[in-house]
Amino acid sequence: MSKRQFGLIYISSYQARLFIVDLKKLSIIEQLSSAQFVQGGKKFEVYENELPRLTDALIGFKRKIAEYGIDNYKVYGNRQLLDKISARYLADQIKVRTGLEIEWLNGAQIAYYKIIAGMALPQFSELTDDEFTYLLSMGSAMLNLTLFKGQHYLSTWNFALGPEEIEEMAAMTRDTPSDPIDIIGDYISRKLVSFKTIEKPTGKARIIIQHVSGRGEQSLRPQEKARVIDLKQFAGVYSDFREAPDQYLMEKYELDTDSLARMKPTIVLINQLVKIIKPHMMTLTQSSAITGLMIQEAARLKYRPDEYSTIVLTATKNIARRYESGGKHSNLSNKFALHIFDRLAHAGMVDRRDRQLLEIAARLHDIGNFVNFHNHYEHAAYIVGANQIIGLSDRENEMLLSILKHQDITNLNADEREYRHLDPALQVRVAKLAAILRLANSLDASRKQKISKIVVSIKDEQMLITVTSKRDLTLERWVFEKNVNLAEAVFGMKIAMKQKRGK
């Protein structure tokens, strides 16, 4: 068994799939799929109704993984159509029946892995800084549209347009005398109304359409992982779907009735986006969130560089800008917080994996001022809860909200209550990150950036933060003393601040 082999099981509301992957070559050695789950009713009911079939498939996947002698395997599930409680129950039933532990992926994570997959395309490395690229992906519950400048991530927009809406549209148009394409077009146009009003970059643009080989999208299926098609060719496809009878479409594009019903809205959607974006090129690719998961595992094991951490931080900065935050105070708090964290990490007192979460909290802790200065930390948590950070898991989102709520020094007695709902192991991690951010915020309490530099030393169960400033720090000292108790409690040492007069 090669250590570079990886078993990836992915469960969606359509079927379960196993991929045996060579992480070094990033190629699929073998792929197995369950029978497609019976659709009908609400999509979230599919998991429950098809549990016996899903269980049988997973047991078969375990046997195949054992045949390869693979120890490194993971099970992921698409949670977009499940609430958290139902997902927890289903995960427990799967574990009892198969021994497999499933990691559910929320919509923000799935969007993140789709972006990674798009960035890994060979064509992506050819993009120049004067070119903009839109990455379009249809998901089980959301449509994701991501914008890049050159090879750099800029932003992602999410639209509530998934299979359920598409199937409802299909049912609605079956018995109407009006042209179904016109009705579908009006519905999709309504979904895109906000995007139409957003100021979009001018200049050369292309559009990449992901996962075109998925269920119900055979008419756009490429023979390779990615290919460029002429926009006139797509215009011909759109014309067919607008003018031709269903029987002709099913024969020409090899579609069944259900696939055709799902395909029509997809074609209309792409056509509307082409009109808005006006790309000079269209690329079709089979890449999907599954591709992104493979790439992530390859990066984790150092088979390829991890080039994607900037996506999460860029998305964070976008939220900060939207709510008129992210200025000098936010940048300085972030700088000080990461410096303190790194010294504590060197001493083995924090988990290095939490560094990114601390940076996100540092950049977003003041966005609640957009709503109201009073209780602005509560407002910050509310805003973040309503704007899921791309790439963060449900657990990481819960931790982030708790860290933000912890910053209210006027309500220090509420500390324990803010994270009591978390798992015990997470409570300590949250308290540590919240304590670090409090200390960092204290050092710019006046919002005047009086301190230019800090040096953190840890010795004999004491932490000394030496700050460089030639200005009066009375306010900073006072706020520091108000905040230091939590840090001393969670790190088990005395913490002091010392001023060094700078030039």
PLM regions with names:
Residues 14, 71, 280:
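Short acidic/polar active-site loop segments enriched in Thr and Asp
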Residues 23, 38-59, 63, 67, ...:
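Helical "lid/coupling" subdomains associated with nucleotide-phosphate turnover
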Residues 71-73, 85:
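Post-signal peptide N-terminal segment of secreted/secretory-pathway proteins
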Residues 84-91, 477, 481:
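Short, surface-exposed alpha-helical segments at coil->helix boundaries
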Residues 280, 491-503:
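A short amphipathic beta-strand at an alpha->beta junction
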Residues 446, 450-495:
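Low-complexity, glycine/alanine/valine/leucine- and proline-rich hydrophobic stretches
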